[in-house]
Every structure is written in structure tokens, then in C-alpha cells.
Amino acid sequence: MTSIKNAELGWNEAGTPVSDQFDDVYFSNVNGLEETRYVFLKQNHLPERWQEFDQRRFVIGETGFGTGLNFLAVWQWFTEFRREYPEATLKELHFVSFEKYPLSKADLEKAHQSWPELAEFAEKLQQHYPAAVPECHRIVLEDGAITLDLWFGDIKDCMPLVPYAEQGLIDAWFLDGFAPSKNPEMWNQNLFNGMAKLAKQDCTVATFTAAGFVRRGLNEAGFAMKKVKGFGTKREMIAGSMEQREAHSNHLPWFNRTASTNHDSIAIIGGGIASAALAKTLVRRGQNVTLYCKDAQPAEGASGNRQGAVYPLLNGPHKGVSRVFAPGFLFARQFVDQAAQDIQFDHDWCGITQLMWDDKSADKLEKMLAGNFTPELIHKLSSEETAEKIGLPIDMASVHYPLGGWLCPAELTRGLIAKLENTELFEAKFEHQVKSLDWDEARKLWTLKANGQSFEHSTVVVANGSEFQTLSQTADLPMGQVKGQVSHAPATETLSKLKTVLCYDGYMTPVNPNNQHLCIGASYDRSHLDYEFDEDAQKDNAEKLVKCLPNQTWTKEVDTSGNLSRQGIRCVSRDHLPFVGNVGDFETIKTQYADLQNQQEQDVEAIHQFPNLFCFLGLGSRGLSSAPLMAEVLASQICGDPLPLPVDVLTELHPSRMWVRKLRKGKAITEL
């Protein structure tokens, strides 16, 4: 995973953007929109195919996003299609595109001025256009009717990372980009083979070029291509379809991800932000969801705090957790902003400032900065800049997350669920603690026992946080529990000047104007897993701030002596990553993979997993930054939709990952 550079542009006399990197225009100086419609939409027979399509979601792949012209054009046509054919089976359009040098937002907005008729669509894209962070960015538009997966990076690196199942992924390919003579590195057999691997059996493909090597290369990859009349004065272009696709997948057998075979009735066990985000994401897809919450209302557990910081957990040069949390954080921003249009909850994108408060923390943050993340995501501040940014005296440098901030997780969670309760697809059962799950193989249903009653569902998701051990199917998952206490301190005139969330060996939020208190925390206690007030933790929360900023007097104004606080128990993992996906059968896997270290990949059978049982656990203390994207991952998996993360990153989230790692090394998994 390498850093991303924005496109370097010039503008010609016609007002068309020209790439400095490739010395080529992004679209035709004359009738660029009409050419897009002719080459990519009409030659892929999209209006006709949409009418006859027998699935809920149609997936388009594109090899060069550029200004987004093709995406905006097909979005406009799909909107007209939905209006004209409201009863059609096809409800959603999914667009997967790649871009090595993404335009800056300013350049994107300028380019979009060329097409006034697309303005309503362009403005929505601009609103959620992502920062230049590598790999996949999912943008959900029109309440899920339109989804854009925008992959930033070289297509030769990104395309092999796109997850796909045996039946393929793409229904239509837009083979676009700068001319082959201008960008020969992209137009090669590896590209054509990659397109074929992602294609479904009935996939079509169209491209503006008539170059012989392109037609021959696509034919060799498995497409049947032919020359057709080009647009306007262009004599020819090529178009075709997949001739014969072999069934294959790029998921490793021991990290297999399978969709639900029946998601007519989905049960979610839990009541926190994970459950709420997942329920919203599934209902958006037209799924019937029932929530089972052991408490009288949502967000009574770890999701019940007044203020929680939202910022990405990053490490080194774009490795490990960064590949989950960087796009996860950006998606969380999108999710929260969209939720705020429908429900009320306290939040403020005021930024996050993380202090270099001692040598160890400074070294850690410098190593993180070595990853060359875009300044839109994170950048360093001097001590003077830090003081100006936070609004209070400070004598140390920091890193700043300008897109970060805080929100009230309790209000967000409850608001999401209350909104869902107004729909016909969702039901919440409070004070229903699920005691057991039993699978009926003959009927292909799960039976949930709660409150002395039995409930049946075709698919179940366990999202009950620190309660995961109460169900036998998830009891062996290698996760831990940590108690946390957050202290609430009243505002003072000085503390009210804090303008950003402040992180050190703890964190402090700005004053919430709606209750005139700030939050400071949070403790980590593995030995007392209860919800009782802890006086020592209360004192320690305040003392950490004084200890980390010994030269400042304002820190002593933080008064926690009123013992205002909240306790919760986090569900945590050793590698700081959530557990999202199919639940493995622990006892069977021990036998099935007893000799895994001596087997070749092609000889290994798919890992044994409980049918139609999934988990969404281990969010730890960064759940607000990861839960929305993890919900999108799991909902996509359950419904068989394209997945929004690289296939190798998905292995890092697989619920059986720690068992498999040990078994591949020949180690027992009885103790983890």
C-alpha cells in the first residue's frame, strides 16, 4: 500500500482538464458526455439489460475514474430507469472504479462545471468525495440506490485486491482511461485477465479504442470482442461480452467468506452502535431485521457514553490497522453526516489533537507520520500551532486529525434504532436476552431462546459486545473484556476554550454546549468486570491530564470530585481489529485443520463455519470510527454484494483468523 498523489492538471482552450502526468484530455473537447453515453452505456446495452435484469443490484466496473463523468452519466440514466420502471427487480446500481491519480476536490468541482445537466448528481458526489487515502472508498448515495467503490492506487495493484466469489462480480465493464499510446503501462494482458476474473458469465465490455492488441488481449482473457461503429467521427471502437467464465474466487479456503443462503429474516443480537449501524445498513438493502436487546433501551452497554472521539487508529507506513481504520474513519464521517440529516444527536467535527507528551509518545507518532498519509487525514503541528489549534496554552508538539471530532454514541445509537422502528422492515425486542442458538438443519433455520420464548430466523448476527461468551457458538472466540470509566467534569470559563478533542495518555473532549460538561477518560481495567463506580479510576482520569501537561495550570480546573461518570465493558481483540464475518465451528476446525501446516492451499477445504451465523464483535475503544464500515462489510457479505475492503484486509477481520494462524504454524488452539 503506497501513498497517493493527486492528479496534476492543466486546462486547455476548451476548458477541458488535461493530465500533466499523461499529456491527454480527461474527456472529449466536443460532446464528451454524449460520447460517454454512446461508448459505455449504449454499447453495454444498459437500458435494455436493466429492464430484464433479475437481481437486486447491477455492478459496473470501470478502469479509470478520472473526473467521474462515466459514473455521473450512468447515475443519471439509472435514476431515469427507476422512475420509469418502479416495479423492476433491479433496485440498486453499484459502480466499482479505479484511479491512480485522483483529482483534488477543487479540480473535480471545476471539471464538473462542464456538464450543467449533471449538476444535481455531481454535487452529491463532491459532498462525499474522499481524501487521497489508498485503496477502497465506499460512497453510499441515494439511500443505497447508488453505491460507488472508488479504489485509489495503481490498477495493477488494486484490481487483484478486489474480493470476488466464484460467480464473479462485474455485470458490465467500462474499459476507459487515457489513450493506450499515452498510458501503455495500464493497457496490457494483466489488465484484461483481471477484468475477466472479476466478470460474471454474462458480463459485457465496451471501450473507446479500436486498437488491435486490446481486442486480441480481451479475446485471450475470455471475452468475445468485435469492432463496432465509433462515436461521431471515430470510425471504430470495440465491444463484447464474456464468452466462458471458469468458477473461481480469491478468498483463501481458511479465510472463506460466504453469503447467507437465506436472508429473508435476519436476527441481530445486541443493542449498541454495531447493532444499530448493521440494522440500518441491512434495512437499507430491503432486508427484514429483528433486534434482540437484553436491556430496556439501546446503548446501555459500551455504546452509552455522552461523548466519544472519532478518529482513525493508524500505524506505520500504511500497514496493518491503518488499512482498516483509514477508510473506516472516512466512511464513518460519511455515515454520521448522512444520519444527521434524519436524527438528532450531539456531535462536532472539531478536529482531534494528539499530543507528543513524552519521548515514547513522540516516537510513536513520528513513526506514524512516516507513513506519508495525506495532510487531509493527519499532519504535524508545532507547539505554537498546537496551542492555537486547541485554544489553550500548551508547550508541546502534536499531530492533528482535521476531519476528526466527537459525537454522542448513546444518542446516535438510540436515534438510529428509533428511526428504524418507523419502518416495516425492522422490529426491536427489548429486555430479550438471547440465552441460546440452535440450528435446525432440516428447516435451515436458527431458533433463538429468549425470555422463555422461541424465535426463528434464517440468519443470525451476534453483536452483543462483551456478552459474546454467553452463546456457545461464539464463546471460544479469542477476545477479551476491559472495563472503562469515563468521568464527566463541569465546564469552566477556561475549559470552555478547548476547541478540539485532546488526546494524551487519555483524552478530553471539548465542553458539550447542551449539557455544559466535558468528558475525560478513560480507564482500562481487566480485573474488575463490573459496572460499579470506581473512585480510583475517577481520580486517575483527572491526574493523567495533569501528569502529561505538568507545566499548565488550566489542567487543574478539571474537577471530577462530583463523581459524575459512566462505566462500560469493552470487547477487545489482541490485534486491535474487529471480528466481522462468518462464525467458525471451533471444535470442528480443530480436527479439520489439525494438519494445516503441511497442506498446500489448493488441497485445503473451506473452513467449517456455522450456517448463516455471523458475528460483529471486538470493536474495542475505536468502535465509532470502525462500526459503520464494518457494518457495510458484513451487510454486503450477508447479501452477496461487493465488499468494500481489499481481500487481504478482510482476512485480518475474519473471526477465525487467530485460530488459523496458530494451526498454520502447527500450534494448538486450545489456549490463545
UniProtKB/Swiss-Prot annotation:
SUPFAM superfamilies: FAD/NAD(P)-binding domain. Gene3D superfamilies: D-Amino Acid Oxidase, subunit A, domain 2, FAD/NAD(P)-binding domain, Vaccinia Virus protein VP39. Residues 269-672 are annotated as: FAD-dependent cmnm(5)s(2)U34 oxidoreductase. Pfam families: DAO, Methyltransf_30. One of its GO terms (molecular function) is tRNA (5-methylaminomethyl-2-thiouridylate)(34)-methyltransferase activity. It is found in: Cytoplasm. Its EC number is 2.1.1.61, 1.5.-.-. It comes from the Bacteria. Transmembrane segments: none annotated. Its main location: cytoplasm. Keywords: Cytoplasm, FAD, Flavoprotein, Methyltransferase, Multifunctional enzyme, Oxidoreductase, S-adenosyl-L-methionine, Transferase, tRNA processing. GO terms for cellular component: cytoplasm. GO terms for biological process: methylation; tRNA wobble uridine modification. It catalyses: 5-aminomethyl-2-thiouridine(34) in tRNA + S-adenosyl-L-methionine = 5-methylaminomethyl-2-thiouridine(34) in tRNA + S-adenosyl-L-homocysteine + H(+). Residues 1-243 are annotated as: tRNA (mnm(5)s(2)U34)-methyltransferase. Its cofactor is FAD. The keyword RNA-binding does not apply. HAMAP family: MnmC. PANTHER family: SARCOSINE DEHYDROGENASE-RELATED, TRNA 5-METHYLAMINOMETHYL-2-THIOURIDINE BIOSYNTHESIS BIFUNCTIONAL PROTEIN MNMC. Catalyzes the last two steps in the biosynthesis of 5-methylaminomethyl-2-thiouridine (mnm(5)s(2)U) at the wobble position (U34) in tRNA. Catalyzes the FAD-dependent demodification of cmnm(5)s(2)U34 to nm(5)s(2)U34, followed by the transfer of a methyl group from S-adenosyl-L-methionine to nm(5)s(2)U34, to form mnm(5)s(2)U34. In the N-terminal section; belongs to the methyltransferase superfamily. tRNA (mnm(5)s(2)U34)-methyltransferase family. In the C-terminal section; belongs to the DAO family. This is tRNA 5-methylaminomethyl-2-thiouridine biosynthesis bifunctional protein MnmC. The lineage of its organism: Bacteria, Pseudomonadati, Pseudomonadota, Gammaproteobacteria, Vibrionales. The gene is mnmC.
